[in-house]
């Protein structure tokens, strides 16, 4: 606790931000409380950290001036620090979250391939080694994705023609080229060009029963054309006789 008394208000605020401890302005009345929180945090962190990295995980006050400018550049996982500070009693069932997985202290690790992935943030000697490990894992994941993309088959325009000719083969093009019903990959491009040209030649009308307009005009009517002309002449003659008799009656009143 006496080590924190030599720190200035700015240095104490930097420690609070580094450990992700909620705090307000550092004044005379709240300074003692913040020093106690930092002391409890570092004590519990040294107790929970592995023995091999207990010295490296503790914060060295001699390097405070050198790391003051880099305090805002990188931070330890905030979830880890928040859970560490908010855990009541600081019991062994404490969850520490890194960028990759969640680890429970006080419980045995499950055997399997996930053991290599589960790593504590405090196992690294410093933050540079941690970020170097994160960078290596990112490069490994990106290289694996590139390998998966290379293994995926590439489908071009010929594959689309192959599916069309497979489900809708043209009979004329098949018989003329003497090809099998199921096309192969080597003859796909040749069949696509030949089928596209010959399919227009062998296409039939959608409604072949429909004829051109006026082709069967006389057959569709009930009365033939000569019968209609005959009826028209008879009607004209009848009108002519009616008109003639009407004129004769007007000329001879008796």
Swiss-Prot record:
N-acetylmethionine modified-residue sites: 1
Entry-annotated residues carrying Phosphoserine: 8, 29, 49, 54, 60, 87, 98, 141-143, 171, 173, 175
Tissue expression per record: Skeletal muscle, heart, colon, testis, ovary and pancreas.
PROSITE patterns named in the record: LEM
Transmembrane region(s): 223-243
Function according to Swiss-Prot or TrEMBL: Stabilizes and promotes the formation of a nuclear actin cortical network. Stimulates actin polymerization in vitro by binding and stabilizing the pointed end of growing filaments. Inhibits beta-catenin activity by preventing its accumulation in the nucleus. Acts by influencing the nuclear accumulation of beta-catenin through a CRM1-dependent export pathway. Links centrosomes to the nuclear envelope via a microtubule association. Required for proper localization of non-farnesylated prelamin-A/C. Together with NEMP1, contributes to nuclear envelope stiffness in germ cells.
Disease: Emery-Dreifuss muscular dystrophy 1, X-linked: A form of Emery-Dreifuss muscular dystrophy, a degenerative myopathy characterized by weakness and atrophy of muscle without involvement of the nervous system, early contractures of the elbows, Achilles tendons and spine, and cardiomyopathy associated with cardiac conduction defects.
Designated name of the protein: Emerin
Source species taxonomy: Eukaryota, Metazoa, Chordata, Craniata, Vertebrata
């Amino acid at each position: 606790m006496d080590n924190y008394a030599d720190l200035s208000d700015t240095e104490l605020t930097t420690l609070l931000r580094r450990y992700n401890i909620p705090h307000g302005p550092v004044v005379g009345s709240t300074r003692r409380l913040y020093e106690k929180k930092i002391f409890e945090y570092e004590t519990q962190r040294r107790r929970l950290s592995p023995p091999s990295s207990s010295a490296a995980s503790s914060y060295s006050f001699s390097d405070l001036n050198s790391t003051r400018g880099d305090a805002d550049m990188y931070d330890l996982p905030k979830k880890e620090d928040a859970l560490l500070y908010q855990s009541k009693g600081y019991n062994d069932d404490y969850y520490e979250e890194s960028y990759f997985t969640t680890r429970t202290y006080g419980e045995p690790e499950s055997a399997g391939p996930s053991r290599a992935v589960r790593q504590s943030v405090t196992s690294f000697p410093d933050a540079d080694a941690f970020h170097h490990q994160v960078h290596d894992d990112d490069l490994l994941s990106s290289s694996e994705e590139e390998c998966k993309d290379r293994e995926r088959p590439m489908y071009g325009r010929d594959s689309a023609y192959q599916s069309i000719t497979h489900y809708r083969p043209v009979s004329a093009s098949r018989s003329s080229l003497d090809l099998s019903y199921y096309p192969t990959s080597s003859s796909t491009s040749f069949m696509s060009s030949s089928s596209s040209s010959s399919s227009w030649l062998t296409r039939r009308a959608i409604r072949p029963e429909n004829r051109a307009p006026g082709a069967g005009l006389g057959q569709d009517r009930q009365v033939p054309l000569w019968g209609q002309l005959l009826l028209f002449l008879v009607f004209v003659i009848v009108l002519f006789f009616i008109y003639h008799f009407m004129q004769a009656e007007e000329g001879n009143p008796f």
